[in-house]
């Protein structure tokens, strides 16, 4: 039987890491105090639920992860600001800059990149009708300048691999060595 505290399930021994997409309540997430965890900034939602913030590099076990969550909503005209759409769905200039600085600190080498949307070149293959924006442009720069083993992303509601790029929707994967 699950244990709940303030309506949030508590899972002793299980750690859940989350990264923002575009439909999260960014105001609520950003109301949590910023802490440091495994080399990067986080919000502890509970001791076992951790929000991995944008532009951070984390060392988890012997692997390094770069995170840049967020995306532009293509349906925001049907949504209500502060209820089903948040202006903070896209990263800020400070988050973009901090991300590049953090990547520079690790010599532009990480094991994994986690993002919600794709870099420009990949997005053209996945959803050519989506317009490029500041975030997809930024991720294209990351793609061209950072060495990585695999890149995992969501946003497009498909499960499909494009070489070392993995678009996840319903699939659950296990990271290997």
Predicted regions and their residues:
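Cap/insert and terminal regions of metallo-dependent hydrolase folds
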Residues: 111-156
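Core catalytic region of metal-dependent phosphoesterases/phosphodiesterases
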Residues: 1-60, 128-139, 144-145, 170
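Hydrophobic/aromatic residues located in beta-strands of well-ordered beta-sheets
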Residues: 16-17, 65, 151
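Active-site-proximal loop/helix segment associated with metal-binding centers of metalloenzymes
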Residues: 40-42, 47, 60-130
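Binuclear metal-dependent phosphoesterase catalytic core
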Residues: 59, 140-145, 156-177
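Residues at the C-termini of beta-strands that transition into short coil/loop
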Residues: 20, 55, 69-71, 155, ...
